[in-house]
Amino acid sequence: MKLPRKVYLIDTNVVLRYLLGDHPEFSPKAETFMFDVSKGVKKAEILDVVIVECIYVMEKYYEIPKTEIVEKLSGILNFSGIVNPDRSEILEALLKYEN
């Protein structure tokens, strides 16, 4: 009998370390993990609250423009290994946030 694949729940820090590359220890680990998710080697879900937290930190603390934030987060949500059942709704909300 084949067991179901593990689905990882990605938190805000993993997303931020991956996108910002600002931590000497954790950013490379996040990059390796997210590379596997991008190729579908690992399956993962990113809750909508994590997306909201990422937006807040990138906009308020790092002063990243909305268009860049939306581009980065949309890119991640379109990784092969992302299994969010509400992916289309989150992507639509990102577009509304941008405008």
Regions flagged by a language model, labelled:
Residues 14-15, 53-57, 75, 92:
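A general alpha-helix detector
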Residues 1-46, 62-71:
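Short, well-structured N-terminal submotif of metal-dependent ribonuclease cores
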Residues 36-37, 76, 96:
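Hydrophobic helix-cap positions at the C-terminus of alpha-helices
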Residues 27-30, 51, 90:
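A general structural signal for well-ordered alpha-helical segments in protein cores
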